[in-house]
Amino acid sequence: MKIGIINTKIRTVFSAFACMIAASLVCTMPARAVVEININKGVIEPLPIAITDFLSADQLGSNITSVIAADLERSGLFAPIDTGAFIEKISNPDAAPRFEDWKVINAQALVTGRITKQPDGRLKAEFRLWDTFGGQQMIGQQFFTTPDNWRRVAHIIADAIYERLTGDKGYFDTRVVFVDESGPAQKRVKRLAIMDQDGANVRFISDGRALSLTPRFSPNRQEVTYMSFEGGSPKVYLLQLETGQRELVGNFPGMTIAPRFSPDGQKVVMSLLQDDGSANIYTMDLRNRTTTRLTSSQAIDTGASYSPDGSQIVFTSDRGGRPQLYVMGADGSNPRRISMGDGSYSTPVWSPRGDLIAFTKQSQGQFSIGVMKTDGSGERLLTSGFHNEGPTWAPNGRVLMFFRKAAGAGGPKLFTIDLTGRNERQIQTPNFASDPAWSPLLE
């Protein structure tokens, strides 16, 4: 089956992730900027930031500004100031602003920029980030792209601002693969879809004729592995996003579920359901198609997720009576239980930073999204309700996306939440949505 929908070779659109910093934009970086956000302090007050409309010959500059502001505001770390409060109107984004005018409205940082169309039809996007109270430019960069990729420029600029002010990589220039759900509950159509992390640019990558679940990105963002009921029983497939070509991952005699890539993209880990009702974890080496069995139990072992360095795997098992989280070596050695709380645990996923494991917990009639340290200590529940499930990490390990279904009629919706549990946002999608998986940063 070929689905020629998505061209993922976006990296060729940009000139060196920015033709990074032309001579006219180079600035001396101070050893320590006056304005910064310490995101390791826990709950913090959002930083007031003024983002002026990028100068352009049409509406595009304003559109780019809106996306940048929305990205930063949604992170919970920034509070974009209403443009109606601006005193100075920026007419030359290359010139130093009147810092006093921005200090009056308590703008801790200021963003100015310009969009121009080049003779070859490309867009040139320039921006500068200013420390208003320090009275200095913090960064200045320029990017070239085709007009249809203007949203990517906005996300990349937002990432640059986020990184300069927090010291952490941003996560805005990313995508999410998920399950789109449409139609009545009794005849729900579930299709695989891909979108920008903010819900824009949704594209379908399966036709919905067969139930498809648990899509997961490869580390290079070019492939998705997922489970499909085509043929009647669940099997794991590999889909090439650029060509739409797909293939069966291992022609196992039983049902295969819950696939996920290894960090180097060379293996897929999954669970194989046995005739006796048990499930064990296997890996398939995508280079030579050899399979390795990692667990051998009479329990249900599933939901495997690698540590960022590929040395360990966290998974769910009911070998102790109810589903709990276990960690083992990537070769299946030394399995040990790490979850010790009441209730049942599932859908574990290791943080890209390596410090935490996110999970779904069912206890006292509620489903919660939580995190714990990799040894099981420090468990924290970030959000609880009727049904919350399926966390996935932003590539910087600071934000989670999950799906929620409210009691009663309706269907699941996607939400993000940060590690404080205080900044929860819904991601708008065309239909109901579930099973999200975040991509690495695009290139």
Curated annotation (Swiss-Prot):
Major subcellular location class: periplasm
Any one GO BP annotation for this protein: cell division
Gene3D superfamilies: TolB, C-terminal domain (2.120.10.30), TolB, N-terminal domain (3.40.50.10070)
Presence of the UniProt keyword Signal in the record: yes
Signal peptide range: 1-33
One GO cellular component, as annotated: periplasmic space
Claim: ATP-binding is one of the keywords in the record: no
Biological function: Part of the Tol-Pal system, which plays a role in outer membrane invagination during cell division and is important for maintaining outer membrane integrity.
Family: Belongs to the TolB family.
Protein name: Tol-Pal system protein TolB
UniProt lineage: Bacteria, Pseudomonadati, Pseudomonadota, Alphaproteobacteria, Hyphomicrobiales
Species the sequence originates in: Brucella melitensis biotype 1 (strain ATCC 23456 / CCUG 17765 / NCTC 10094 / 16M)
InterPro entries: 6-blade_b-propeller_TolB-like, PD40, Tol-Pal_TolB, TolB_N
Entry's localization field: Periplasm
Keywords (A to Z) from UniProt: Cell cycle, Cell division, Periplasm, Signal
Subunit: The Tol-Pal system is composed of five core proteins: the inner membrane proteins TolA, TolQ and TolR, the periplasmic protein TolB and the outer membrane protein Pal. They form a network linking the inner and outer membranes and the peptidoglycan layer.
Cross-referenced NCBIfam families: propeller_TolB
